[in-house]
Amino acid sequence: MRRSKRFEVLAQRPVNQDGLIGEWPEEGLIAMESPYDPASSVKVENGRIVELDGKSRAEFDMIDRFIADYAINVPEAERAMQLDALEIARMLVDIHVSREEIIAITTAITPAKRLEVMAQMNVVEMMMALQKMRARRTPSNQCHVTNLKDNPVQIAADAAEAGIRGFSEQETTVGIARYAPFNALALLVGSQCGAPGVLTQCSVEEATELELGMRGLTSYAETVSVYGTESVFTDGDDTPWSKAFLASAYASRGLKMRYTSGTGSEALMGYSESKSMLYLESRCIFITKGAGVQGLQNGAVSCIGMTGAVPSGIRAVLAENLIASMLDLEVASANDQTFSHSDIRRTARTLMQMLPGTDFIFSGYSAVPNYDNMFAGSNFDAEDFDDYNILQRDLMVDGGLRPVTEEETIAIRNKAARAIQAVFRELGLPLISDEEVDAATYAHGSKDMPARNVVEDLAAVEEMMKRNITGLDIVGALSSSGFEDIASNILNMLRQRVTGDYLQTSAILDRQFDVVSAVNDINDYQGPGTGYRISAERWAEIKNIAGVVQPGSIE
């Protein structure tokens, strides 16, 4: 067949490199409204749920039992379930119905009922609802700070830059598992150099991650995963109860804690039980609520390639963020793994959360070039900073970031690199050369960094852990090296571990180390003139884009 020239051009477009698949309900490859999803139902006897979404208590699997016993407001359940799904959907977008009124209903309905509510809503209505249902009034952002070589100097410099760019949380992980303590240490020092009060985590194997937190090298955890079918749980030798125990281990030691889930995970692992991705995710969100965990990272997360490949998949991602907020949970709304070759698709996917605002719009944005992102690449990376800042300016939307100058960025990267150099020297760790400090000051990514002696580093990591190095040792090393401000910031982060105030729902810290959470900054949106509004000071910051032609400069 003779080819159309237009179709030849279209075939070369980036979007046509994306993988898309038709709906296959039997294998769970359907975003919402699978013919195999259960109809919603609930029955309460003697204060106990004895029927849930078409199953009697005798038929419950362990997830049903956990949800029925711990996650639903039982006294209100039968009354709330009598409301029509369309009526609840309309309440979600009605500015005359408060968030508080809706929470009383949405914490008392079942996972299947939530699906029926979401089925009534288009993405604009979901965004309207999310703007109202977000737990914390003020939106914010989280980033990834990693690199291919696990270079601690580069991590410190990138973390400092991410701090001045406005990220409230920063997350790292490793290429080599044994590097975790160095990465956590570098992230802590760099982030507190960039901005006081940034929360940090190192996503690794749970025992190591918990130990790093207990030593004061990290301040939160989020990669404790939960799933929507029993088979996926047991495949990992887990149950909702074991996950709840792990969550309490973090929180009881003063570490902020959220779970992670996301549409598509069960289908990806081959245990979907023919249910839709959103129904199974709804169960995950209820598990989170039942475990007493304050928040959830969801939005397909690392399974976005699966969810984004099926029809209405990106709509389902927005719906799962909304469902989590309807359970009065903190929402870290993903946008954290690349899923499309198309700049148009990846931007549209992000606008679903950026426009209404979530507790963390990204979880996280890659603060490094994606070739250095050890979480498999983010939807936006360091090369998109200017685009993102101009989007905020174009739309007058607070996406949690701020423009920075080249001069201040170079200065803060240099300070962070010198600070981590001093810490390594004071703690007797492998020396960081002036060449490394200079390279990190000006680097874009690991391609611009000299190699370190990995064998020597890993031996030092092991020795550091045997010596029981803690956050207080870091404070002492910085103080004795003249970095009093960073030392003070880290000491204040350690104090937060004692007070525990930042364990509140949706908590972040401002630059004075005051907690900003759903307790003291509760979202009170009820239409125009209410809820979060960009202040004059913040708007001036957003507008301050480098290269803007100022009227006074025109001759």
Swiss-Prot record:
Keyword GTP-binding recorded = no
Principal EC category: lyase
Q: What keywords tag this UniProt record?
A: Cobalamin, Cobalt, Glycerol metabolism, Lyase
Could you tell me the Gene Ontology terms of the biological process aspect for this record? glycerol metabolic process
Stated EC number for the protein is: 4.2.1.30
GO molecular function terms here? cobalamin binding; glycerol dehydratase activity
Catalytic activity as recorded in UniProt = glycerol = 3-hydroxypropanal + H2O
- Cofactor needs: adenosylcob(III)alamin
Describe its assembly: Probably consists of three subunits: large, medium, and small.
The record's family statement is:
Belongs to the diol/glycerol dehydratase large subunit family.
Q: What protein does this entry describe?
A: Glycerol dehydratase large subunit
Q: Which organism is it from?
A: Citrobacter freundii
